Structures are given as structure tokens and as C-alpha cells.
Amino acid sequence: MRYLNTKNIIAAGVLRSCMNSIAWGAIIPDRTRIIMNESDKGEALKLTNQSKKLPYLAQTWIEDTKGNKSRDFIVTVPPMVRLNPNEQIQIRMITQEKIAQLPKDRETLFYFNVREIPPKTDKKNVMQVTMQHALKLFWRPKAIELEDDGVMTYEKVEIIRRNDGSIRFNNKMPYHVTLGYIGTNGVTMLPQTQSLMVLPFSHADTQFKNVPSTFQVGYINDFGGLSFYEINCPTVNNSCNVSVAKRDK
């Protein structure tokens, strides 16, 4: 059991965001990403109403990577719940029979959505904003589960610096790899609040160029923190040298 972005939509009074880009409203979860192991048969997440005065409704559901609501593989229980001021409630994620149809050799990505609904107001000319957030939910089959005390390592991600200074990440692992930092001296080159996700057994390129031959990357780990690596690329279009950085937070 382990304790994940870029959807920002303002429409019909709904603000949808990710954990990294816009602060949560009254309702907050106990983590920023969700890992569901097949052997656990399910997972639980706690929601807390931070408001000291107002009750809120919290609506939860699962979406696939195309933004379609799905109850075929995982469902949330309860799908709607009331949280009184300062109250904490547990939401369960339960697998369905069709979960057996998912690939056994790699992770499958879903999104856990939570929408907070404030109480109605009697005041006139007041627009209420409903906060909606999506957390990455990674379904991890038994064949690739980590031990309880296991820590993900990222040496199998091949890094190549190309002629124009852009970086290619070849993910040779069965896990989704998300980069939350690419840069030097603590200054990231990633656009503000954005990350770069590489699908299992796939690759992704940076949109920015002119990356120096020596830099650092920070992978977002299972716990939502960053695991840092030192990257040294003595030549272009060849694999760079990768070593664990001294810091890991």
C-alpha cells in the first residue's frame, strides 16, 4: 500500500486542477498520487475538509486517460459523501472483474477525480466556484509489484542528449516515469507547474532545447517526492551517464 497533471479547466463554474499547479480548496486528499497493487484488491484514500465553518460534499469517480468516466475496472465507494467542518472520511477504491483484462506486464494509468461542492449561499450576485482535481492512479499488476519497503530506481531510463540539445528519455521499465525536475543548480527547465511523463516501454522528448551536457533530473517517486539523478552526456545521440544524486527528497 503506497501513498500523483496538467488539466486546468474553468467552465460552468468548475475549476479543475492538479496538485502541482493550483492549491486545493477545502477538501484535500492524504497524498498526491495513488498506487494500486493487484495483490491488495483495492486501496483507500482519506479526504479532509479543512474548512472550520462550512460542510462540503465530495464527489469522486475514476476516469481513463482519455477523460472518460469508467466503472469497468475500479470504482470509488462512496461516490458522494458529506464532510462536516474539520472532518476526515475514507474513500475506498475497489477493483472490478474486468481488471483482469488489463496488461500484466506494465502499469495502467487512471485518474482519481474529486470534486468539492460547497453549500448553497443565500447571497445574491455571488458566483460559487467548485474545485475539481485529478490524481494519477497507477494500477500495478502482481508481476511488477515492489516489496513493501522497495524503492523505485530509475537507472533503466536511458537518457540521450540530441544534436539540438533536447533530451530523449527511453523508458525501458514497466512503470510510468514522471519527471518533475530537469535542470541545473536547482533551476528547472520544465515549464512552470508542468511535468513530463513517459509511458512504460516508450519514450518522450523535451520540448525545450540547449540543455547543457551536465544536468540533474528528478523523478516523482511512489510517495510523491523527487528522486534525483546526476546526468553527464559527453557526446550527443548516445546514452548519457547516470548516477544517483546525493540529495533525495
What are the residue ranges of the model-derived segments?
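Bacterial N-terminal signal peptides that target proteins for export
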Residues: 1-11
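Bacterial N-terminal signal peptides
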Residues: 12-20
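Beta-sheet-dominated interaction scaffolds and their linkers
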Residues: 24-48, 147-161
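Buried hydrophobic-core signal for structured, non-transmembrane domains
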Residues: 43-49, 93, 110-115, 165-171
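Intrinsically disordered, low-complexity Pro/Gly/Ser/Thr-rich segments with frequent PxxP/GP/PP motifs
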Residues: 71-100, 188-214
